[in-house]
C-alpha cells in the first residue's frame, strides 16, 4: 500500500515536471509584450480567473504586489456585478482561463474594450476567444494533466503558477534596470 502511494506521488511530480519543462521555450514576443505592457502601466494590474485559475490568479496578484507592481485580484462574477467599476482605463487586466472560453469573458471583454483597458491572457488555448482578444498571450498549455482520471487541473495549474512567477520576476527585473 505505501509503495503504491509513493508511486502515485512520484508519478504526479514527474508528469508535472515534464509539462513544466516545456514552458521556457514558449517565452517569446508575447511574453516580452506582456511584461512591457505591465511595466508601462500607469495604473494597476487586475488579475482575474475562475475556479483553480482564480486561486492561482490570487497568488499571481499577490506576487506582483509584493515585488512592486500594484495589483489585485477580482473574481469575474463580482466584476460583472459592479466590480468592473474599480478598473480604470490606465489599468491592465490579466485574465487566466485554461480553456480561454469562460462564458463570463463574453460579457467582460466588451466592457474592457469600451474602457480601453489592455487585456493580457494566460491560457492553454492561444486561439480561444480570450487569446484572440488579448494584446499578449501567455501559453500555459499541457499535453497531459497528472490526474489519472483527467479531472483535476494539476499540470496546468503548475504551469499557470510558474508563468505568473516568470512574468512577475521579468517585470521586477525590468523595473530595476
Language-model features and meaning:
Residues 2-40:
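An N-terminal, well-structured beta->alpha segment
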Residues 176-177:
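Short, intrinsically disordered, charge-balanced linker/junction segments flanking boundaries
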Residues 43-172:
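Glycine-rich phosphate-binding loops that contact phosphosugars or nucleotide phosphates
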Amino acid at each position: 500500500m505505501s509503495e503504491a502511494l509513493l508511486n502515485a506521488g512520484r508519478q504526479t511530480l514527474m508528469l508535472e515536471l515534464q509539462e513544466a519543462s516545456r514552458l521556457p521555450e514558449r517565452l517569446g514576443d508575447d511574453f516580452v509584450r506582456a511584461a512591457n505592457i505591465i511595466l508601462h502601466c500607469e495604473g494597476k494590474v487586475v488579475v482575474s480567473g475562475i475556479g483553480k485559475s482564480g486561486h492561482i490568479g490570487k497568488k499571481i496578484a499577490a506576487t506582483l504586489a509584493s515585488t512592486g507592481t500594484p495589483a489585485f485580484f477580482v473574481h469575474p462574477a463580482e466584476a460583472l456585478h459592479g466590480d468592473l467599476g474599480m478598473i480604470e482605463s490606465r489599468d491592465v487586466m490579466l485574465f487566466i482561463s485554461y480553456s480561454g472560453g469562460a462564458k463570463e469573458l463574453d460579457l467582460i471583454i466588451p466592457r474592457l474594450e469600451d474602457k480601453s483597458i489592455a487585456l493580457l491572457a494566460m491560457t492553454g488555448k492561444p486561439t480561444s476567444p480570450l487569446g484572440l482578444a488579448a494584446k499578449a498571450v501567455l501559453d500555459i498549455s499541457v499535453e497531459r494533466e497528472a490526474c489519472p482520471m483527467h479531472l483535476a487541473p494539476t499540470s496546468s495549474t503548475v504551469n499557470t503558477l510558474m508563468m505568473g512567477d516568470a512574468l512577475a520576476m521579468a517585470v521586477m527585473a525590468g523595473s530595476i534596470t
